Amino acid sequence: MELVQVLKRGLQQITGHGGLRGYLRVFFRTNDAKVGTLVGEDKYGNKYYEDNKQFFGRHRWVVYTTEMNGKNTFWDVDGSMVPPEWHRWLHSMTDDPPTTKPLTARKFIWTNHKFNVTGTPEQYVPYSTTRKKIQEWIPPSTPYK
């Protein structure tokens, strides 16, 4: 009987993603192929799902969009692609998704969500406010004879 339930669940996963092709596409992008109820979609195209049959911590997930802010994100997904209003629902800080209870506007929340820019030319690099302990040696500018 348990084997029948496992096979039934596997068949639901394949059909829930639109057949074998859709199942493989989702599996290779996310390394997981869960089936759940669609809770909502943000303005960037990320889709958020929930399945209460899964254990806590894996019962909510996101399927990322293939393009965000002009960047192709089909294979290059990043956790910072989730906007703050969905972040709090995704990490179980609240039980109400932003589709039912919108996030209150705050000054520090941007209207257009950005990626994490660490390791890119746009990253923030603070300038040093202290003198260096060791100074670099600058060779003389006159050429040797």
Curated annotation (Swiss-Prot):
The keyword Hydrolase does not apply. It is found in: Mitochondrion inner membrane. Its main location: mitochondrion. One of its GO terms (molecular function) is NADH dehydrogenase (ubiquinone) activity. Keywords: Acetylation, Disease variant, Electron transport, Membrane, Mitochondrion, Mitochondrion inner membrane, Primary mitochondrial disease, Respiratory chain, Transport. Pfam families: NDUFA12. The modification N-acetylmethionine is found at M1. One of its GO terms (cellular component) is mitochondrion. One of its GO terms (biological process) is mitochondrial ATP synthesis coupled electron transport. It is a peripheral membrane protein. Accessory subunit of the mitochondrial membrane respiratory chain NADH dehydrogenase (Complex I), that is believed not to be involved in catalysis. Complex I functions in the transfer of electrons from NADH to the respiratory chain. The immediate electron acceptor for the enzyme is believed to be ubiquinone. In NDUFA12-knockout cells, complex I assembly is not affected, probably due to substitution by the NDUFAF2 paralog. Belongs to the complex I NDUFA12 subunit family. Complex I is composed of 45 different subunits. It is linked to Mitochondrial complex I deficiency, nuclear type 23: A form of mitochondrial complex I deficiency, the most common biochemical signature of mitochondrial disorders, a group of highly heterogeneous conditions characterized by defective oxidative phosphorylation, which collectively affects 1 in 5-10000 live births. Clinical disorders have variable severity, ranging from lethal neonatal disease to adult-onset neurodegenerative disorders. This is NADH dehydrogenase [ubiquinone] 1 alpha subcomplex subunit 12. It comes from Homo sapiens (Human). The lineage of its organism: Eukaryota, Metazoa, Chordata, Craniata, Vertebrata.
